[in-house]
Amino acid sequence: MNSSKSLRIVFAGTSQFSYEFLYALLESRHVVVGILANPDRFSGRGHKIKFSPVKKLAKYYNIKILQPDSTESLDNLENDLKKMRCDIIIVVSYSIILSKKILSLPRLGCINLHSSLLPRWRGAAPIHRALQSGDKTTGITIIKMNDEIDTGPILYKRVCSIQDTDTTETLLNKLSIIGKAAIIQLLHQISIGKYNLQYQNNSIATYAKKINKKEAKINWNLPAINIDRNIRAFNPWPVSYFWISGKYIRAWKAKIDINNIFISDPGKILNVNSDGIHVGTGKGILILEVLQLSGKKRSFVKESLCLYKKLFITGNIIQ
């Protein structure tokens, strides 16, 4: 029986999603010897330095952190990485592209956990695009990295169903759970040399382009089902929005009126009640349930019904 060996890992990531994987690795038998994270950001009126979730965790565990701001600056850190003597680099939600030079450093190569079932939704926003497209399933794919984006051979894949109420936030949570288990299992397989590579079928690949904030403005000419998908895709960022009476409103949650699926009255306020704000679309009625006025906390429409009845007057058109 082959015994699993402890691997020396350099972890590349920045976000809260990445943080969950780093924590799982720190709790495993493997050793995280270095971190690649995005540069610190300045935040708030005081322009204070804001550390990423991954950097905070790395500092707590006293792990060496490298923060290049480009592929070129990462290449310049080649000697620093060599000194770490890592067996493998694990990439989870990291924005800087690794060059051939960096990819060739670890003896076991570099692997990337991607939040889709590759080759579907290669690129920067796979969860958002899966929700917008009405996909019924998504998942995680772990690939052996090459010098192209998300095209490397597949090492591990796990499927996750998408519910009609899922948002990007809820799917990230689901994928984090299955992804952490997958990473640990795959590392065991790699450490004993028992793993398979499956090459991707490029002919069925789709691309998930980066989210632009302008996409979040609600287009009431779309069918209700598409607006609902967008609202869920853009939760928690950049958050769908619209304007009414000169006020900027964020839409966090909505549902489709299944009893009126053929009505076409884009942007028209049809009713305001404890169920929500009923708005006509290109096809069907969308019921806005959770909104956020500028400078206020988000709230259910039914919790602030008097306020919303003054703002959303039946018959008016939302911009």
Curated annotation (Swiss-Prot):
InterPro entries: Fmt, Formyl_trans_C, Formyl_trans_C_sf, Formyl_transf_N, Formyl_transf_N_sf, Formyl_transferase-like_C_sf, GART_AS, Met-tRNA-FMT_C
Catalysed reaction, written as an equation: L-methionyl-tRNA(fMet) + (6R)-10-formyltetrahydrofolate = N-formyl-L-methionyl-tRNA(fMet) + (6S)-5,6,7,8-tetrahydrofolate + H(+)
EC number(s) on file: 2.1.2.9
Gene Ontology CC: one annotated term: cytosol
GO MF annotation terms: methionyl-tRNA formyltransferase activity
UniProt-annotated binding residues for (6S)-5,6,7,8-tetrahydrofolate: 116-119
CDD domains the record matches: FMT_core_Met-tRNA-FMT_N (cd08646), Met_tRNA_FMT_C (cd08704)
Domain of life, source organism: Bacteria
Keyword entries, A-Z: Protein biosynthesis, Transferase
Family matches, as PROSITE patterns: GART
Keyword presence, Transferase: yes
A Pfam short name: Formyl_trans_N
Enzyme class name: transferase
NCBIfam families reported for this sequence: fmt
Function: Attaches a formyl group to the free amino group of methionyl-tRNA(fMet). The formyl group appears to play a dual role in the initiator identity of N-formylmethionyl-tRNA by promoting its recognition by IF2 and preventing the misappropriation of this tRNA by the elongation apparatus.
HAMAP family with a match to the protein in the record: Formyl_trans (MF_00182)
Recorded family membership: Belongs to the Fmt family.
Protein name: Methionyl-tRNA formyltransferase
Organism: Wigglesworthia glossinidia brevipalpis
Gene field: fmt
